[in-house]
From Swiss-Prot:
Disulfide bonds: none annotated. GO terms for biological process: mRNA catabolic process; RNA processing. This is Polyribonucleotide nucleotidyltransferase. Involved in mRNA degradation. Catalyzes the phosphorolysis of single-stranded polyribonucleotides processively in the 3'- to 5'-direction. The gene is pnp.
Length: 711
């Protein structure tokens, strides 16, 4: 029999339900979590035994949105869901980051978390629901996991923090922050903000962590009622004698190697030391495992770097804790791009471009939460050559998608609205060298490239990555961390913003016990670093260029009567197609009558504007126009009078005498003066050649052939 166990609790303005025991009973654990009609089904499967020779923790997190959750059928030929979207990839990373550090050291059994969105309320984002579900499922599973975690979204509306704001509330919020953590400590922060202060950001993190305690309490209560027995897993016993022998051979040599400031030289020397140490030990005892020796050497490396930092000694590359690496900033480095910059910080370098397009270049995104159009695109590429390696080149990986999204958040707060700057903007960051914080280099490069392109950004923005080394109560916060310091440290803390405040904050903590004081120190130290970088950037370019690139399309905006839109478009789009071909421009028309003409040549744009004005001009009764015969019928002729307008000249209005045959007087393509007699309710125009020639005698009236006149 199915015996579901359910927990219900109020979480901010929403009701959350946790249910287990109903579905997927062959999985290690399964939970259905719902928050006001948004429901996510989360399963966990863990392997009881690790694969032989496994030397890393194979945790996989899959997040998938089913279109039936929103009452939709997928598009595409096959009408079913395909590869994960960018949004799904970002949420999978959001779930992964706070749970990964909570598995014990040495646990290498394969674990897979699958979160499936099965129902969605457009006002409640599934990401927080999925994070709660993953935490609950892992806690119920019995797998060694030092959770549970809670998760919360924090908004900032009318100077007040708001817990789990709805999608509608987020539109007026100056902050969108997701925080996850255990009962004791914050583990992850992901946010974008409208240039808030350090204190406001820290307050949001603390608020979110306090509010999510109710989630942790309810998961713990559910585990007491329905949790599986904890696995009897023990880490492998530490071979103290072997550790001591490896340390004796390698520790002092590794300590010397980590005084080499050049990354490639240091890596080469470290590789030599490791290879020689392993070779020596295996020669002494053939039963030793090279992978195990590699892990011991890695632990020694970590200890060497950390102990030096904690002792106040210079860092790996010789810097003090709050020193930024040398900066080189250049703009306009690529001649034909609309905007470009090369930003170099030590051994990290980003070549960033900005491209301007029209509204039709914007990305149409069809999500479960509804359709939207994105007119600011940010793409981050991390080729293998940036770290001196070979590798696959192809579609972006999870890391590239995540870093691109973070960099975009860093710049978003200073971007103009589509009304202020009616262009689609695409920024691409090519990481050409990498040794720490390429995403923050992308923020700096993007700010420079946008200014170089003439995009009216509100301010320059810069980003910096901070690190942390902590042992007991002793801690050191590091500015502008290297790749090694990120890997061997306890925290990765990225902050982007302008001189006025923070635009993006991302934090990943690998240990418990990060206090509010440590976060405060890190934020303040990051501010000093950010202002230093902005000072250097401003020497290269301190304001957006006054004009956009000569190679960028110039968008001219005019307004027409919405009733005239159909005239500009024409039947089946015939008029607008002809206009774009004739003028060499791109023309977009909005429902309110706003017309945007994009052209790289100003004369072409003016030509298009004149033609549109002709088409939309009101026909004046009694006015004389120059027309061209477009069609001849038995009862008269149709004459085009410019602007796509056409009227009928009845046979009785061709000449001041009786006309038997229209073709005796008019030919196709013939230019004639016409007077507007009437425009009826349906917009049909009556014209007269006879009255036009009477009014303007200089205009020759059409005559019958000479033979006819002589009769």
């Amino acid at each position: 029999m199915l015996n579901p166990i359910v927990r219900k609790f109020q979480y901010g303005q929403h009701t959350v339900t946790l249910e287990t025991g109903m579905m997927a009973r062959q999985a290690t654990a399964a939970v259905m979590v719902s928050m006001d009609d948004t429901a996510v089904f989360v399963t966990v499967v863990g392997q009881k035994k690790a694969k032989p020779g496994q030397d890393f923790f194979p945790l996989t997190v899959n997040y998938q949105e089913r279109t039936y959750a929103a009452g939709k059928i997928p598009g595409g030929f096959f009408r079913r869901e395909g590869r994960p979207s960018e949004g799904e990839t970002l949420i999978a990373r959001l779930i992964d980051r706070p749970v990964r550090p909570l598995f014990p050291e040495g646990f290498v059994n394969e674990v897979q978390v699958i979160a499936t969105v099965v129902s969605v309320n457009p006002q409640v984002n599934p990401d927080i629901v999925a994070m709660i579900g993953a935490s609950a499922a892992l806690s119920l599973s019995g797998i060694p996991f030092n959770g549970p975690i809670g998760a919360a979204r924090v908004g900032y509306i009318n100077d007040q923090y708001v817990l789990n704001p709805t999608q509608e509330e987020l539109k007026s919020s100056k902050l969108d922050l997701v925080v996850a953590g255990t009962e004791a400590a914050v583990l992850m922060v992901e946010s974008e903000a409208e240039l808030l202060s350090e204190d406001q950001m820290l307050g949001a993190v603390v608020f979110g962590h306090e509010q999510q305690q109710i989630v942790i309490q309810n998961i713990n209560d559910l585990v007491k009622e329905a949790g599986k027995p904890r696995w009897d897993w023990q880490p492998e016993a530490v071979n103290e004698a072997l550790n001591a022998r490896v340390a004796a051979l390698a520790e002092s040599r590794l300590s010397d190697a980590y005084r080499i400031t050049d990354k490639q030289e240091r890596y080469a020397q470290v590789d030599v030391i490791k290879s020689e140490t392993i070779a020596t030990l295996v020669a002494e005892d053939e039963t030793l495992d090279a992978n195990e020796l590699g892990e011991i050497l890695h632990a020694i490396e970590k200890n060497v770097v950390r102990s030096r930092v904690l002792a106040g000694e210079p860092r790996i590359d010789g810097r003090e804790k709050d020193m930024i690496r040398g900066l080189d900033v250049r703009t306009g480095v690529l001649p034909r791009t609309h905007g470009s910059a090369l930003f170099t910080r030590g051994e990290t370098q980003a070549l960033v471009t900005a491209t301007l397009g029209t509204a039709r270049d914007a990305q149409n995104i069809d999500e479960l939460m509804g359709e939207r159009t994105d007119s600011f695109l940010f793409h981050y590429n991390f080729p293998p050559y940036s770290v001196g390696e070979t590798g696959m080149v192809g579609s972006p990986k999870r890391r590239e998608i995540g870093h691109g999204r973070l960099a975009k958040r860093g710049v978003l707060a200073v971007m103009p609205t589509i009304e202020e700057f009616p262009y689609t903007v695409r920024v691409v960051s090519e990481i050409t060298e990498s040794n720490g914080s390429s995403s923050m280099a992308s923020v700096c490069g993007a700010s420079l490239a946008l200014m170089d392109a003439g995009v009216p950004v509100k301010a320059a923005v810069a980003g910096i990555a901070m690190g942390l080394v902590k042992e007991g109560d002793n801690f050191v916060v590091l500015s502008d961390i290297l790749g090694d310091e990120d890997h061997l440290g306890d925290m990765d803390f990225k902050v982007a913003g302008s001189r006025d405040g923070i635009s993006a904050l991302q934090m990943d903590i690998k240990i418990e016990g990060i206090t509010k004081e440590i976060m405060q120190v890190a934020l303040n130290q990051a501010k000093g670093a950010r202002l230093h970088i902005l000072g250097v950037m401003e020497q290269a370019i301190n304001a957006p260029r006054g004009d956009i690139s000569e190679f960028a399309p110039r968008i001219h905006t005019i307004k027409i009567n919405p009733d005239k839109i159909k005239d500009v478009i024409g039947k089946g789009g015939s008029v607008i197609r002809a206009l774009t071909e004739e003028t060499g421009t791109t023309i977009e028309i909005e429902d309110d009558g706003t017309v945007k003409i994009a052209a790289t040549d100003g004369d072409k744009a003016q030509h298009a504007i004149r033609r549109i004005e002709e088409i939309t001009a009101e026909i004046e009764v009694g006015r004389i126009y120059n027309g061209k015969v477009t069609r001849i019928v038995d009862f008269g002729a149709f004459v085009a009078i410019g602007g796509g307008k056409e009227g009928l000249v009845h046979i009785s209005q061709i000449a001041d005498k009786r006309v038997e045959k229209v073709t005796d007087y008019l030919q196709m393509g013939q230019e004639v003066p016409v007077k507007v007699l009437e425009v009826d309710r349906q917009g049909r125009v009556r014209l007269s050649i006879k009255e036009a020639t009477e009014q303007t005698p200089s205009a020759a009236a059409p005559e019958a052939p000479a033979a006819e006149q002589g009769e």
